[in-house]
């Protein structure tokens, strides 16, 4: 954010509610015809707050259809089903180490609407988006980790829900604990 401000871009930081979720009314007021990018986390890495990315994507599409929507899905990938096209997400970032894959590798989903420029110029690898040798073992490890995260996905989600309910039930029996 600071880098963009230093480059002369106007940056708007939006308020969140008591649960850490971006206030949609504030977003709606902040969106303007000259808005070029909105970036949110899908799940906050510190609080666990889940952003309403589908609603945000629809709002951006309606209010400023030329703007791009970036979602940091690093905490969400493998734990939620994510539908970039349906949710009007143009850029989606994921990191391998958050899904038990190798460190130092990830991916950026880029919708055809998003015209991005490479950060490192050179050899033209990765469709001209990044110079240098592909990290083939890391990429393969990310692929395996992603596949494993989504195998039996519904059963895993149900199991985690049951664990959460069991923990909440146990904690609620302790005096002075508020959930």
Model-derived segments and spans:
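Pyridoxal 5′-phosphate
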Residues: 1-179
């Amino acid at each position: 954010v600071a880098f963009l401000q230093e480059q002369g871009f106007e940056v708007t930081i939006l308020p969140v509610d008591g649960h850490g979720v971006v206030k949609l009314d504030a977003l709606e007021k902040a969106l303007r015809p000259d808005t070029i990018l909105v970036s949110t986390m899908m799940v906050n890495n510190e609080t666990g707050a889940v952003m309403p990315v589908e609603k945000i994507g629809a709002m951006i599409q309606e209010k400023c259809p030329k703007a791009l929507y970036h979602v940091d899905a690093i905490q969400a990938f493998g734990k939620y089903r994510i539908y970039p096209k349906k949710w009007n997400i143009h850029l989606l970032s994921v990191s391998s180490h958050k899904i038990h894959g190798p460190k130092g590798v990830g991916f950026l989903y880029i919708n055809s609407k998003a015209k991005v420029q490479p950060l490192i110029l050179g050899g033209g690898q990765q469709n001209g988006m990044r110079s240098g040798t592909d990290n083939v073992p890391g990429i393969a490890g990310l692929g395996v980790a992603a596949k494993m995260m989504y195998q039996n996905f519904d059963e895993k989600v149900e199991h985690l829900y049951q664990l959460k309910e069991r923990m909440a039930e146990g904690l609620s029996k302790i005096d002075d604990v508020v959930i």
